[in-house]
């Protein structure tokens, strides 16, 4: 990988916000899933979460994985599992839902560890999910339409989170908050995508990428990579 590419990936890693995420509860249209993931990447989200029960899990996970190779998609079989995982990371759970207790999405402090919960396109967030959320939020609507597309709504909220975090200097870190192993994975997959595919296919561990963006691997690793099959 050339120095420019290495520097760009390192800059991206330093700006990643591991304590900001989105959870999609049965969002089932691939174009919406893809759009949400692209926006998540644009504001520095490292990992998004999705609840896809039963047989839809594999299909939707595959569609999501193809949306953006820089954003991880963690799937959960139930919303209870997802929320328990996220609250275990100290995140506030915000549900996009009109209720008597809902507040304008811009009134929330997004510099706190935050998960934005988005519901299924037609039916919205389930009652089970609403009961688990910490706060309902709304996007004010002053026209004739009553709702926005789920990917549009998530984009508005994510960019408010990005605005607040940028003002707080949370994108100015010199070092990434991601674990070293995760940084190495992204450096190799992003800097050497062809080699990464071969290594995956052959079941080889990823090599170390040094501070010059160069691969550090022994002769046996290279020999296995170059062998036919």
Curated annotation (Swiss-Prot):
It holds the Pfam family SpoU_methylas_C. S-adenosyl-L-methionine binds at residues 96, 139, 148. Belongs to the class IV-like SAM-binding methyltransferase superfamily. RNA methyltransferase TrmH family. PANTHER family: RRNA METHYLASE-LIKE, TRNA_RRNA METHYLTRANSFERASE SPOU TYPE DOMAIN-CONTAINING PROTEIN. InterPro entries: Alpha/beta_knot_MTases (IPR029028), rRNA_MeTrfase_SpoU_C (IPR022724), SpoU_MeTrfase (IPR001537), TrmH (IPR033671), tRNA_m1G_MTases_N (IPR029026). Catalyzes the 2'-O methylation of guanosine at position 18 in tRNA. Type II methylase, which methylates only a subset of tRNA species. Keywords: Methyltransferase, RNA-binding, S-adenosyl-L-methionine, Transferase, tRNA processing, tRNA-binding. SUPFAM superfamilies: alpha/beta knot. CDD domains: SpoU-like_TrmH. Its EC number is 2.1.1.34. It comes from Escherichia coli (strain K12). The keyword Cytoplasm does not apply. HAMAP family: tRNA_methyltr_TrmH. GO terms for molecular function: tRNA (guanine(18)-2'-O)-methyltransferase activity; tRNA binding. This is tRNA (guanosine(18)-2'-O)-methyltransferase. One of its GO terms (biological process) is tRNA guanine ribose methylation. It catalyses: guanosine(18) in tRNA + S-adenosyl-L-methionine = 2'-O-methylguanosine(18) in tRNA + S-adenosyl-L-homocysteine + H(+).
């Amino acid at each position: 990988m050339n120095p420019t590419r290495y520097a760009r990936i390192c800059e991206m890693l330093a700006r990643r916000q591991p304590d900001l995420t989105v959870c999609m509860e049965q969002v089932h249209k691939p174009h919406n899933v893809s759009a949400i993931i692209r926006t998540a990447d644009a504001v520095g989200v490292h990992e998004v979460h999705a609840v896809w029960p039963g047989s839809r899990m594999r299909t939707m996970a595959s569609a999501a994985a193809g949306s953006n190779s820089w954003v991880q998609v963690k799937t959960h079989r139930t919303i209870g599992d997802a929320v328990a995982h996220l609250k275990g990371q100290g995140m506030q759970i915000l549900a996009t839902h009109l209720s008597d207790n809902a507040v304008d999405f811009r009134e929330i402090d997004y510099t706190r560890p935050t998960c934005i919960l988005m519901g299924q396109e037609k039916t919205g967030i389930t009652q089970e999910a609403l009961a688990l959320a910490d706060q309902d939020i709304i996007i004010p609507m002053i026209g004739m339409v009553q709702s926005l597309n789920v990917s549009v709504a998530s984009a508005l909220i994510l960019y408010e989170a990005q605005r607040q975090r940028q003002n707080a200097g949370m994108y100015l870190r010199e070092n990434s908050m991601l674990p070293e192993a995760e940084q190495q994975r992204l450096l190799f997959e992003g800097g050497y995508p062809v080699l990464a595919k071969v290594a995956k296919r052959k079941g080889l561990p990823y090599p170390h990428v040094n501070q010059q963006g160069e691969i550090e691997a022994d002769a046996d690793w290279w020999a296995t990579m170059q062998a036919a099959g």
